[in-house]
Amino acid sequence: MQFFSTRDTNRKVTSSEAIAQGLSDEGGLFVPESFPQVDVRALCELDYPALAAAVIREYLTDYSPEFLAQAARTTYGEAFGGKAGYLAPVEGDTYALELWHGPTCAFKDYALQLMPRLLVEAKKNLGRTEKTLILVATSVDTGKAALDGYHDIPGVEIAVFYPTGGTSEIQRLQMATQEGANVAVYAVRGNFDDAQTGVKKVFGDKAIAAELEQRGIRLSSANSINWGRLVPQIVYYFAAYAQLLKAGKIAFGDAVDFCVPTGNFGDILAGYYAKRMGLPVGKLVCASNENNVLTDFLTTGTYTAKREFFKTTSPSMDILVSSNLERLLYHVTGSDTEVAGLMKSLAENGSYTVRPETLAAIQETFACGWSSEKEVAGEIRARYEQDGYLCDTHTAVAFHVAAQKKRSGVPMVVLSTASPFKFPRSVLEALGRTAPENDFEAMQQLEAATGHAAPASLAALRQKAERFDTVIDPAQIAEVALGYQA
């Protein structure tokens, strides 16, 4: 399997090169040359680690099947507490795919616990011995998951950049207390898009790349712009379908809809790949919060990033520049020239408009909707009081939109992307309680109010020492990168 850039299909690389490099030289994202067709029925018989290895090896063809099988078995074992890809019934034929049972209590663990192994193996495959410097812009959960996955990995340094004031206190402490000799964390003045733009500028700066290479350092990414982040997320769509099949809730071949809370479009794009591989995915419903740039685009065909930015209770979705949408645009248009033009317009004008036939093709698979802050709080309370199901703010966004887009007779799977205990104050307030200012006190009150236990890794943060408190401007991200030595 070869990969090429969304902006220049003449730039072809192997999967190892795509993962080691992260972003194409001209700024495009790597995509596979084709969608492998798989035996869905056979895959549905496998446990999660075996399923992961089987799906991933269809794309990572220069990795040995033995390596992928062992890596998947190691990754998705004890660290996920036996709940990798766990599907929970909620109400009727609506389900929650709980993706927060990993080490950092967010769906990013599915990719970022495996990805360090993929990177180390990629370097072996390519015969590379240089140090890898990973730069991560995060709306929060990616940062902690990347830090947890990459800490103390030999030959790797990782620096994470998150928007100051754009996280819950629990999320901030998850990053600020991270252990490891090779990790660094910076708060960036501004929002996620400011951090992401700063990191992308470093990746696109040939002078910085040349200077670092002279020191024996190569840049790479752990954001979902890296193919190694995206491919493990395809797996849990198959896992959800398999569980519905085994439970007798569907017959083989029946369509299942998925509603995904997303800002950067990576998690929902993984569902698109699953569909193109042959999984009977019906509609992929894109759920946004008040930063509803994706809802507007999927409705009108015009993407406008120049708009008011809202800090919401679902901060991982507080994004206005959605990177992975570029991959979908390439797959739908089939034109690197067209995609390059659209991305140029976005960079220069803050907007672009796709052709009507492109929008129509996208709407065949994708539906959309958004939730206000009031609706998010109401959804948390409704799900708990009516169904006994406790969810976080991001998942509540998706539940609200899923109810609007639910099709009669078609099961709806909502991707539950984070533990409710990562946002204890917001969840407690949504349940009609007065939340204390301290997140840990709120966590204890949420436990008492609901009878649910907070994940041990979150409760333990209270006793951990903070290591990182540096605040920088977006323009200083380049200085951070240039400060590294081999």
What are these regions (language model features)?
Residues 1-486:
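PLP-dependent amino-acid enzyme catalytic core
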